[in-house]
Amino acid sequence: MSEKLLDYFEKEKNYDEVIKIIDELILEDPEKASSLLFRKAEALVGLKKYQQAITTLKVYAKDCSDKDKIKSYVLIASCYMNLDNDEMAEKYLVKILDIDPENDIILKQLSYMAYINQDFERCCYLIKILIKIDKADIEDYTNLIFCCIQLDMIDDALKNAEKVIELDPTNLDVFATLTIVYENLDDEEKLKEVCKRIISLKDDGTLQIILLKAQAYLELGKKQKAFEFVNKAIKLNPYDPFPYLMKGLLYNKLDMHDEAEECFNEAFRLNPEILDSMEKLS
């Protein structure tokens, strides 16, 4: 009867009753503890009693199969995240890798945590494991490119950028990254090659592709075409500061600084925070 009540209260999310019944069942038969502690921990999580859930799960994980250990470590990590303790959350995610080194879900989670914490070396290491086990997706490769650039591993960044384009031939973020990298490397030949590839992309009318093509045309010396595209962006998005920002950058490349300043002022008028973007692009 108690087991049926337990199932009922779990379904109803009446976690106080769930915990009460589990405690009674364990008192009646202590040997049932190992099979009930995880359910108790889940109920404690439902009540947002994360620290108590962690304590319960640690007891449960002492004497269970590797499969159940992984399950408990995932929930412990989740509890620590809810307690804003990423360091301990990461510790338990790593414990999962000790049991299952090719767990792609955990590798992705750890790589993302490393990425947002700007631990670029660790992020690279984890994503390379995902690549090795053939579980890396476009987002993983994109994060890897950024990390490689931050670590001044330009050859690796370029190699992985080409891999992303191979997987997704219309990935605009990677094309934009390639133009910046080749421009910084003063590799005019490669820059022009990328710009030609950008121009060949289908124009789907989005702001990003229009501005990217405007920039590409200017790099290829097609000034009139570049301004046709940036003016098209302004016409389609008159209240968006980024077309004005791009137009200013195009004017700057042509040493037309007065015209550039007018565009920057208009972008700033539309969004004063646009200065942050200008600093990143400068």
Listing of model-derived features with the role each one plays in the protein:
Residues 34-35, 68-71, 105, 139, ...:
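Start-of-helix register in tetratricopeptide repeats
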Residues 30-31, 65-67, 101, 135, ...:
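Short coil turns that delineate tetratricopeptide repeat
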Residues 11, 46, 82, 116-117, ...:
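Register position in tetratricopeptide repeats
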Residues 25, 59-61, 95-96, 129-130, ...:
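Canonical positions in the second alpha-helix
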